Amino acid sequence: MCMAPYLDKMLEAGVSSIKIEGRAKTEYYVAVTANAYRGAIDSLKDSKGDWVLPQWVSEELNKISHRTYSTGFYLGKPENAQTYKDAGYIRDYALVAVVDGYEDGCITATLKNKFLSGTELDCLEAGSIPFGVDTTLLYNQDGKQIESAYQPMMKIKIPFCREVK
């Protein structure tokens, strides 16, 4: 279920809190979902008149592992809302690293999943629209340039123009 496009209607109906549903959700899932809904709520709060869900919010919610989204019974009786053909999860993105800090012009991070240098990564920073990070230059913790980050919990460095929180 995804009600983000209908936040304005939910607030008009008196909803005052939102809960992330599901069992065993990862820190990545919770971080993306919380950041996306925070962005949607802030956008709604700042809107003057007709509100439309920001495109980046929809894109982020489609990056996390999910089944086909629906609105359940919130907008009336659903027609053909139960999906049998595509009942599996959609998993097109993966968490590859968690940022630990920033030193000497580089993001320092702990690897979660492997990737090759040159792969553009999406960076999720609390309270911000996600942005791309170029990994053309990729270093191990000793500062040696590497072609791939491959070992779980490996410490890596990626040159970047600013600190990421």
How does the language model describe each region?
Residues 1-165:
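Surface-exposed amphipathic alpha-helical tracts and adjacent flexible/coil segments at the periphery
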